[in-house]
Amino acid sequence: MNPYEYAATHGPRAGDRVRLGDSGLTIRVESDAQRYGDEFLAGFGKTARDGLHLKAAAVRETCDVVISNVVVIDAAQGIRKVSIGIREGRICSIGRAGNPDTLDGVDVVVGTGTSIVSGEGLIATAGAVDTHVHLLSPRIMEASLASGVTTIIGQEFGPVWGVGVNSPWALRHAFNAFDAWPVNIGFLGRGSSSDAAPLVEALAEGGASGFKVHEDMGAHTRALDTALRVAEEHDVQVALHSDGLNECLSVEDTLRVLEGRTIHAFHIEGCGGGHVPNVLKMAGVPNVIGSSTNPTLPFGRDAVAEHYGMIVSVHDLKTDLPGDAAMARDRIRAGTMGAEDVLHDLGAIGITSSDAQGMGRAGETVRRTFAMAGKMKAERGAPADVDHDNERVLRYMAKLTINPAIAHGLAHEVGSIEVGKLADIVLWRPEFFGAKPQLVLKSGFPAYGVVGDPNAATDTCEPLVLGPQFGAHGATPAEISVAFVAQAALDQGNDLMPTRRRRVAVRGTRGIGPADLRLNSRTGSVDVDQRTGLVTLDGDPLRSEPADSASLNRLYFL
């Protein structure tokens, strides 16, 4: 069997290279858990049969579900072809699939009662974690799931001015509403308060999992310090949208207020909000975890023009007021937008997110992240001594998965494909990688993916569309998803949250920084020239030209 026929049947072998959509990125498979000539394969006349590669045993002794022979791209696993065993919603084993009674070296025991997801020729990633979502519409869930996002840290509960939710009454209804979608959910409480009472109330009584300090509601010294003090006491994260007008604090002042305490700096480039013109200075600071939102990724020719209208709309500005118009324009800087891409490529910004409906697009974070990776490869080049982009691909994958999970205390449950974690796994056809997933498994159960004509003879008959699977119907979404809350909510003991989801306490959010992120731990001195807009890192200038076009875009979407 020649290599192309083998790959078409069993998936690529170790050493084979795979193109990722039209991104310009290529991965090389580092290892293959299969053994040549004795492969596990389901189908008519294949080896996944009783007495061959299926063990005759109770399901509890094997797996509920197995994903066979899939290429994993994961910051923890690397890029490997393996099978993934799932039991009771969690990853229970990774490696070679089969029957240990007939095969040697079996890691994933597949039984006669195991359901099989054929992963040959597909790519598996951990479900993306979006930590910056303004939940102004319930339809955001559809866009997120259809892009491979399985965990959301949100603010608001509809078209209300919130920037964080503190009311236990509102959080109770919000958690209840989310039981309709197969997505893990956590809420940020509003941290812009000089008094700690509403913050503690949000955590202990409402079930919030962190705070959002936002300039529109107050990002001054007292509010920021109060949020950080409560966060330190309760082990939750503080997300910061800093003082763009520099009314109370400059970027240097904000860093002093932190006093070395951990913070997650949202849209650290600044167009989405933050100290004008040099909030990007916070990137590379050891206690600041920086993230980007997707409208500026990758930096393109229309980015400057596009953002004026978005800023005006989201922040309720009046364009006929000269002061409002000037405030909007001051936030838009081509120099920092271009430098943002380079800082990502260097690993100095470790997270990407959407800022959905708060100047971002819920369904575009994954594809814009890899479009940025492709742009950086084209602009900055690939390593001369290798014929693949594994290092770059894994760095950008970490920005979507494990790093946001680490920042918000979720990494013990989600963010990577590791034994013991929830089986939130996204399967992609290589030609659609980053743009449109083939299947989204939530706790190992089909939740969203490609569906065909329901009246057709087979499930692959056109038209093929992305839509809900059985995991998105009935009571199942709540059963296969979790609610991330503060430990204080679990300790409270009084059940004010009607959600049917399992509640999981966030942890490990304090005393961390870029050094704790995967593959994105670069620190250094970032400066922005206030006259020219030139950005430097440790004195070296950072420039990136606006792209005329972006990958993973028009080829896949009308």
Residue ranges: model-predicted function:
Residues 129-133:
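Metallo-beta-lactamase
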Residues 73-83, 397, 405-439:
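Acidic, glycine-enriched loop/beta-strand segments at the rims
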Residues 425-465:
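C-terminal, active-site-flanking charged/polar segments
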Residues 1-50, 196-203, 207-222, 244-248, ...:
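Active-site neighborhoods of metal-dependent hydrolases
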Residues 1-62, 466, 474-512:
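Flexible inter-domain linker/hinge segments
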Residues 461, 540-558:
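Short, surface-exposed, low-complexity cationic segments
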Residues 113-122, 140-278:
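Hydrophobic, small-residue-rich alpha-helical packing segments that form membrane-like cores
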Residues 35-65, 72-125, 453:
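Histidine-rich, glycine-flanked metal-binding segment
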